[in-house]
């Protein structure tokens, strides 16, 4: 069960295709198939179901995937610790879409300029999945917003995670021009909310403010970008909630109505004890950006 076999397995699990995984890895498909078969023989269980040229993880494969990803993460962490970060390596950073758009470009550009040997691998998603990915070792750290009912730093500590406040964001409801007379969330007449898929803190706050949960009048349109959400609002078809810092970056029409929705902190979370140089450099860069 060598690291290369684990990397091949994780790639095939991600692509669910030997051909695509082989292209991604720069290997021949036959060699990828052989390594997967050897890994299955070593473990003593089938990791994939193969039917009609399609692949899917078996129950054993799904369980093994989490461990394989964690083992690879630990190997990378050990390499960082032993070399003192001299060889660069990879720091896997997760982020909400809003933070990636409004806060990270300057921070990560400054980091790269100072530590060019370290590769920053950025992925985005809702806060809850990001927290889980940090907990299980799929990510080294992540910028998230904690839901009001989450329990704050104490709840993170129970998960074995540490945290540090990064930025305070002012949230706002963005409404169509037809909502010009609205003064509070209860006045909103448009009954369609544009939001990211479930698991995002901002979506939960919007649903609470607007009384979406349990309502037969409201519907939620799931979208993949703030640009699409803003366009939907401009078309008069929905409302959305977003940080004011993101709205400031957009070309939203001045005719759209905004209502303040309160502040929320963006925090950086990581596994307690995670102390590789590349991450310490990120903490230092974050501190420098805040000062």
Name these PLM-found stretches.
Residues 10-28:
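Short helix-boundary/capping micro-motifs
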Residues 40-57:
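A short LG(V/I)-centered, amphipathic sequence patch enriched
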Residues 42-43, 64-85:
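Alpha-helical linker/hinge and terminal dimerization helices associated
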Residues 88-151:
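Central regulatory/effector-binding core of bacterial HTH transcription factors
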Residues 126-131, 135-139, 145, 199-255:
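Hydrophobic hinge/microswitch elements
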Residues 158-168, 244, 251-265:
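Short beta-strand->loop
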Residues 185, 189-213, 276-280:
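Secondary-structure junction motif
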Residues 255-291:
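A late-sequence structural motif
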